[in-house]
Amino acid sequence: MIRLRRLVHSVLSVGLCVVLVYVGWLMGESHRVVTFKLMPVALVVGEVEHPAHVVQRGGRRWAAEVISNRGVSGRIGRPGEQITASIGTLMDPLASPHFLHVMEGARVLVSEGWGQRIRMVDTQAMRVIDLPTASDLSLNAPHGICVRKNGEWLYIADSLNSRLVRVSLQSQRWQVFPDHDRRVAYGRQLLCREDGLWLANSYENRVGLHPGMGSNVLRINDFESGRSEVMAAFDDANMTGLEVVDDRWLLVGLWGQRQTIGVVDLLSESAVTYLPPRDDIAGPPYGFFFDTTSRELLVAYLGDIRGRSQTGGFAVYHVPHR
């Protein structure tokens, strides 16, 4: 059973709602209801225009601006202290920053979603450092990026090459995921988790991409094995971002006929729950970030990136403990 409740408040001049998603599941002979809650805290518009991804750590947020080719940083709750990082130079600008990964030592990795590189931002000096990679890596529109804690490898969804690669942060070594099942097509957000790599993967009508229909979430336990597992599939929509909450709830951003957030209970065989599309912000839900300390979920909304008639922003939700 799915039950939706909405309670409207005024926070930062933005209407908020409480969305309750109820997922019924069957265990043995007993039937009980398990609840997943998303409680909106704020909707931030105006500070960023077309963000693909927003992340936070240590009281500060970073946003990747797709159209303006910039990174934006600011303290949480203090919009007047926003800092804009000049990414690159006029002669060497960033080609549409898409996804971010916060590393140790005040460094943030940024993918060039419409370019060929991964860049590193020194957030203390607010300057950009080119990340050294092998000259023959030849990335094409890299999107999702992630690094495991204390890990050697940077994992990259190399979207227009229809592949998943990893690059050593200690040397010039790099490897391509063998993908024996030919499932990887146009990868967007990528998560590095203890239980493997999770990829938001879409089958789009583009030359050179692996064929397929709709989109799916792939999990890869062993990179060198070349094998992947389909965790969820959507026949009628492309996929943007994803996040896994409490090792149970898979959240995905959907673009197309369903321009909303889908919720999958990984511990049951129940159907996907689709949250109501938001009518207070433009564009599809794109990059996701779950802060396990504050239990805040940040969802970036692109706005209208084609006609550019409407800007986007990001929503902040609180996820209560079950």
PLM region spans:
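N-terminal Sec-pathway targeting helices
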Residues: M1-C17
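A short beta-strand motif characteristic of beta-propeller blades
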Residues: M39-V45, I83-M91, R127-S135, R173-H180, ...
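Beta-rich, blade/repeat-based domains predominating
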Residues: E47-R57, M91-M103, D136-K149, D181-E194, ...
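Conserved beta-strand positions in repeat-built beta-propeller and related beta-rich domains
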Residues: A63-R70, V110-Q116, I156-L160, L199-G212, ...
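Short loop/turn segments that connect beta-strands within beta-propeller blades
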Residues: G77-Q82, D122-M126, S168-Q172, N221-S225, ...
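Blade-level signature of beta-propeller repeat domains, shared across WD40, Kelch, NHL, RCC1
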Residues: P285-R322
